[in-house]
Amino acid sequence: MADRTAPRCQLRLEWVYGYRGHQCRNNLYYTAGKEVVYFVAGVGVVYNTREHSQKFFLGHNDDIISLALHPDKTLVATGQVGKEPYICIWDSYNVQTVSLLKDVHTHGVACLAFDSDGQRLASVGLDAKNTVCIWDWRKGKLLASATGHSDRIFDISWDPYQPNRVVSCGVKHIKFWTLCGNALTAKRGIFGKTGDLQTILCLACAKEDITYSGALNGDIYVWKGLNLVRTIQGAHSAGIFSMYACEEGFATGGRDGCIRLWDTDFKPITKIDLRETEQGYKGLSIRSVCWKADRLLAGTQDSEIFEVIVRERDKPMLILQGHCEGELWALALHPKKPLAVTGSDDRSVRLWSLADHALIARCNMEEAVRSVAFSPDGSQLALGMKDGSFIVLRVRDMTEVVHIKDRKEVIHEMKFSPDGSYLAVGSNDGPVDVYAVAQRYKKIGECSKSLSFITHIDWSLDSKYLQTNDGAGERLFYRMPSGKPLTSKEEIKGIPWASWTCVKGPEVSGIWPKYTEVTDINSVDANYNSSVLVSGDDFGLVKLFKFPCLKRGAKFRKYVGHSAHVTNVRWSHDFQWVLSTGGADHSVFQWRFIPEGVSNGMLETAPQEGGADSYSEESDSDLSDVPELDSDIEQEAQINYDRQVYKEDLPQLKQQSKEKNHAVPFLKREKAPEDSLKLQFIHGYRGYDCRNNLFYTQAGEVVYHIAAVAVVYNRQQHSQRLYLGHDDDILSLTIHPVKDYVATGQVGRDAAIHVWDTQTLKCLSLLKGQHQRGVCALDFSADGKCLVSVGLDDFHSIVFWDWKKGEKIATTRGHKDKIFVVKCNPHHVDKLVTVGIKHIKFWQQAGGGFTSKRGTFGSVGKLETMMCVSYGRMEDLVFSGAATGDIFIWKDILLLKTVKAHDGPVFAMYALDKGFVTGGKDGIVELWDDMFERCLKTYAIKRSALSTSSKGLLLEDNPSIRAITLGHGHILVGTKNGEILEIDKSGPMTLLVQGHMEGEVWGLAAHPLLPICATVSDDKTLRIWELSAQHRMLAVRKLKKGGRCCAFSPDGKALAVGLNDGSFLVVNADTVEDMVSFHHRKEMISDIKFSKDTGKYLAVASHDNFVDIYNVLTSKRVGICKGASSYITHIDWDSRGKLLQVNSGAREQLFFEAPRGKRHIIRPSEIEKIEWDTWTCVLGPTCEGIWPAHSDITDVNAASLTKDCSLLATGDDFGFVKLFSYPVKGQHARFKKYVGHSAHVTNVRWLHNDSVLLTVGGADTALMIWTREFVGTQESKLVDSEESDTDVEEDGGYDSDVAREKAIDYTTKIYAVSIREMEGTKPHQQLKEVSVEERPPVSRAAPQPEKLQKNNITKKKKLVEELALDHVFGYRGFDCRNNLHYLNDGADIIFHTAAAGIVQNLSTGSQSFYLEHTDDILCLTVNQHPKYRNVVATSQIGTTPSIHIWDAMTKHTLSMLRCFHSKGVNYINFSATGKLLVSVGVDPEHTITVWRWQEGAKVASRGGHLERIFVVEFRPDSDTQFVSVGVKHMKFWTLAGSALLYKKGVIGSLGAAKMQTMLSVAFGANNLTFTGAINGDVYVWKDHFLIRLVAKAHTGPVFTMYTTLRDGLIVTGGKERPTKEGGAVKLWDQEMKRCRAFQLETGQLVECVRSVCRGKGKILVGTKDGEIIEVGEKNAASNILIDGHMEGEIWGLATHPSKDLFISASNDGTARIWDLADKKLLNKVSLGHAARCAAYSPDGEMVAIGMKNGEFVILLVNSLKVWGKKRDRKSAIQDIRISPDNRFLAVGSSEHTVDFYDLTQGTNLNRIGYCKDIPSFVIQMDFSADGKYIQVSTGAYKRQVHEVPLGKQVTEAVVIEKITWASWTSVLGDEVIGIWPRNADKADVNCACVTHAGLNIVTGDDFGLVKLFDFPCTEKFAKHKRYFGHSAHVTNIRFSYDDKYVVSTGGDDCSVFVWRCL
């Protein structure tokens, strides 16, 4: 019995005792079929109460902790814990998986909820962020996710009446979520004063925004919107765990054991207290309730389920019970009856009836029970306790017989002897005690040899011996009852054991895996009858093994269900059942045993479906004698597809080497050559490790692949068209069922799949991001909409794609060994089959995952490695080809029969209408009928069968066949040897294409006179190829060893070949027969060359570091060149045949003279003068420039120079073929590079006439033929080589504005940092001294004077309740573009400033606002499609900025896109249909992302450029083509599926043009693109080639261009000095040939336009300086609509004391006076310096302005003439004030001073006093009402009071308390302590202002918020209202004179906001 096979018998889960009531809630429901659904451990249970039956869902692999019922009451969603937890949606009727949601949550899924129509599912994770996710669950697609909360979330629910509203609750919070686009945004519920902030445990949503929630204290909290509106107190007396909403109303259940029913308005109906009922008990706690019509379900903490019928509510029925919380270890089965007993840490012992599936008795103990044992007659029951004691009970009435405590540690194992006389008790102390049953359990023996705790014990049949296992893994034997150790091996061997529950011992060594020391098997039990053993382990698996199982690593069957530790397993007395107990899940599973041969087939397909199937994956072999793997298959399974370095590493390598060598001054790089190459033909086909990779297109062309190229071969013309989109070896290829589309998959770190069109060779979709290493198998679905792929990662992941969209639909792990083929079921789109090494699996897609079943072999066959598979014509038939040569025929997943087809593996199979064709390793093609009953015809592939039209020769007869296909009356065959043949049905075969076999190709030589070349490879063949139009192999010869080099003699008659063993031979070039051979070296021969003319000498270079020189005529070695310190890589002769140039692996360039090999040292200048016969060397000054910057890693393997010494071609280790102009002096020359080879280009050679370049590709086995395209012929068709990169060093032009914009760093903005450098303790953190004011309330003293002088304009004091944004002065032009548009045919305009999107009506001038952004808006675009009228998109700065799409008229948000562009989004644009949106970020990669904005789905994303991208715009007629421009950047993009492909703009040979920094883009018909450059030129592109320049369209940079869709006219805007004929705005015709200029009349020296838009007869212009101007097209008149401040912070602000005017003063050097009523600019004055503060005099006549340079000026308000100015300080004036009597001027500066001036003394402004002792810079000042005092706030968070005008500080609190102030703008002081927020660590409150009525204060802070408080504001963290609009810093704020308006100014946003007071 020493085989290791799995047993043929099986288990099936029949019953589970238990319900998970702990740590879960809301997990119990009625289904539509009136069954009860719940979960326990890892099993979903559907329990039918009427029939008392259970169904199980086994799709999880760990504990289930959450459950939701679909509105249809049939589907169920369950979520689990685990490292990669997933959600299963399954059908409660047939317990099959419907969908899997995975790859998002970690740790676990805590809550689930379906929305009201059941389409979407919300889930909450157990991760630290408690992530909330919304799924389209049928598709398995994540719609949105967001951080849920910092603490646990307990419940989540959809609002049934508002489709996008979700509510979640948990620890101390409730949140109301809105789903918009892909953004989930939450608002916290406001508890307010209505109820205490506390933990909310459950919730239900009702109509009209009402939410009911259950709180921890037993109250019901009722919410309306976000606010708590009322509480229902004492609904329960403790926490409410569960709330269930249904038609009838609501049911709640709590920790108090009560169920309460409420009507739909939450009025109480009734209360049921389960504690008071018959089965109730103290401490009963309800975790889950469900109400359906007249029935209620309640699940309790202690794992019971009650059913209550409402009419008989005092008689609840206990329909299910299990063990409570606490580990469950004890299990014993009755020796005579179908009874089981369990004991648990919940201190109960329970007796279960296995026949009735019911609990029949329960007995509570004082202590936790850890082991139980029945006496052999079943009358007594022994219990082992956790405290070291044991108790014996009488079974019939459960009364105690004895209670003995001899040990301290837990008793884990006990057994009665088979004769019933002894009880052995094993404890964790180590010994086993033996007690005599008849003597009232007197202790009579002790087994004490064990050093560790006892884990298992077994008695011998005769009760004379005992064996033990312990924690140290020892197995010991004792004589009974004395307990003496037994050591004699012989004696032990013969003992028959009564039971076998030990895990150690020879009989069970097979249960342990090989080579590991683990202790994770907790329990086993042997069934001697059926020779099987059951085991339970720490991974939650119950396994069946054969018994005995002697060899380690035996195969088994495994069963899932328990989640974590299975603590015990036992057979029932009659072996009908196995019982298993779960430790942590404290459940008992009852499994039915199905012996071998019973209803085998029926059972195999039982609906035991789940993620893991019940026949294990680790143990998938039913055989111990696994057949030998076929050598080909074994070799293939061992191929490693990892690369040392991938092409995508190149930019980084370049960057690193730049950083390393940054000191090198940059010399002028050599120019790239004019000539170019075109790939014309490739010899080769990849057959050695690929299959099914050869197809006919409908046009009859043949498509296959080699290296990184997919080939479309025309049989008639023997020509090839090539798809060159891949950048590494292609490994798989498949063709679309309907169209001529092909999918190809490649090698790669992130391996890509391309779907492309064979007609146009254009990529339709590029699929990435799912596979590692490579893609080894592909197949289209029958309808062609989906594609399935298999990767080469360790799990061979399977991915199902919607290829057009480029989205993955579903993924799963495939198999641990290689999968060879995947096939889609032609009848069912969602089914697949895979075959591979010892593997066949049938897959069913379920949402985002797959469920699988393994093929069931039964007795028909045994598990084999399968090489190919096909579906039959009948629906459920599958045919697979095995490594043995058999065809296996399957029906569904059952094997029907096998048919012998080939000798050796069946590698290929193709299904026809009426049959199949197969191909095998035996080189035979067989045609079969449709059931593989008859073989209709065979074709052996032999040389003799080849037709004359063949394009080559067969290397050998019967080559192994790897691919086969039928079509066009032929069979197409691909062989392992790299041949493609076409077999005519009548027999003759034509060889179409061939190449080398597996192995690297290095040797390449071109014939000196004819178009012929030779190659030699590690595949041990030498081949001669014809390169004329025939393209075929002329001759081939097998060699004894592989070879790495070859060379023709000068006359072409002889061919020398160097081999890898150090020998070389010379063969006749025509017959390839030997002429001579030598073996002088041990290491490989690396290069070989004949000298020129007569070919007198042959030089042979080897890896032995020598070059040997032979005389050809005498066949003697005449010289040896010594002196190289490393292996030789290249050699070349000079044209006289005298001098040899040698390169070595140590990068030495050496020279030797023939014949003796004497070494010469030659100076570099001389080397160039020598005429060389050939140049294949890679070192020396003339080819220094061929080495890339990162060449420490990659090597240039080969070079070849044309005869005229003008072009040098090289091949390198990145698969690039490059062309350089020779000589290549200086570093890093420019080149043209070409792709096609995959990893290494090993050799390159020009043909004798230099018209063709030949290259060979190392491991890709390909020989590629490139034709040289000369300069002259190119013009007609521009050749698109990958140009060498446009270098950063190259100057892209300069302009100050562009440079500034490039340098803007948005990160400093994101994190709200204080805008002033304050130091000290924040006010709300300072310790407060007790003020005088806090006197006793009753006092005879006179009343305190007012804090603030009240201006009694109106008699009644007005409280400001609310602010509303009324108008904004500002437009962001300084770093944005194209952000100003017409709406509604020119009636409105839309633009942005700060964080506000603004729509302004041109006729009324009124504005409306979009205020949902949280920081500066950076870009704005309007959807041009009529279907999406007035749809606007805007985006902003931020760490995870969002794009908002909104309706410009209603301001309603249509979608929100959360982006990955860190820092901010700086340009967005809609596609032609308006459905897509493209965005580009200011992140370091300048990522470009395309979105489907309505769904919120990201379509594609890719790094755009290393420097700033300014504009990215879709072509106006396309949804897939767009253009991006930026700093030296011009790319033309195509959206292919979910990938972005680009072509760089090719400048070509247009004389003056070079790649500039491009700033703007416009479009014309016929694929014309116009781009505006930094130097004022406009570049005109056709496709991606530059065709002309519009020179100097503007004199400075062309910042903006606008394409008018209706007539194609183009508007440009630039930076230009206004002249007569020029202008900063121009209107052009469609081709930009003629234009008309417009002046803007702004009066500035240089006009700089940032945005243009054309409406009906008008052009809308936005300038850098914040002006918005409308220009008439006819009359060229310009009208200024908005004239905001220019760039620079605005700090100065003052409102007029008696009129609706205010003044703002900014760092832009201007002061502006605005009219509040008419919302317009009245006047502006240029001050010449940045201004920091402003103040009106109380009489309104004068205004004082303080400057940043320490100067201040006083202007007369009416004329704005200067009345006086003075500069007594050198640093900034921070605040300036005029006293209430117009007499004193106070000037506060950064120099810690306040200066006083007397205005009555006239304009010379002499200082009359100043304040000192000010601790820091001044920030605000206020005069007292009588003008005698001034209060000064400082940068140290200190407020001081000084006398005026002497400046003495007042310190007596009594005096200060009595002062009445004329105004209050201070942010410091007890009166305003409440304005400081909690989160002000890095950010300050910058400004404040109290109303003239003295009742309110408004503040502005570093978060960009304007806040409204009551005044005085003396309680910390006072309540307030907050208003958004400004971006980061609000710098100043004032009420207007009559408190009707608030004016606020922004720091960075340069905007002035006017708010109406309500």
From Swiss-Prot:
One Pfam assignment: HELP
Ranges for the WD repeats: 59-100, 104-145, 148-187, 195-233, 235-273, 280-321, 323-362, 364-403, 406-445, 561-601, 725-766, 770-811, 814-853, 861-900, 901-940, 996-1035, 1038-1077, 1080-1120, 1191-1230, 1236-1276, 1412-1456, 1460-1501, 1504-1543, 1553-1591, 1593-1638, 1685-1724, 1726-1767, 1768-1807, 1880-1919, 1925-1958
Acidic residues compositional bias, start-end: 615-626
InterPro entries recorded: Beta-prop_EML-like_2nd, Beta-prop_EML_1st, Haem_d1_sf, HELP, Quinoprotein_ADH-like_sf, WD40/YVTN_repeat-like_dom_sf, WD40_repeat_dom_sf, WD40_rpt
Keyword Repeat listed: yes
Keyword field: Cytoplasm, Cytoskeleton, Microtubule, Repeat, WD repeat
Keyword set includes Amino-acid biosynthesis: no
Coiled-coil regions, chain positions: none
Compositionally biased region (Basic and acidic residues): 1322-1337
Coarse class of the protein's main subcellular location: cytoplasm
Region spans: Disordered: 603-626, 1322-1353
GO-annotated molecular function: microtubule binding
Subcellular location: Cytoplasm, Cytoskeleton
GO CC terms: cytoplasm; microtubule
Family according to the record: Belongs to the WD repeat EMAP family.
Function of the molecule: May modify the assembly dynamics of microtubules, such that microtubules are slightly longer, but more dynamic.
Full protein name: Echinoderm microtubule-associated protein-like 6
Organism per entry: Homo sapiens
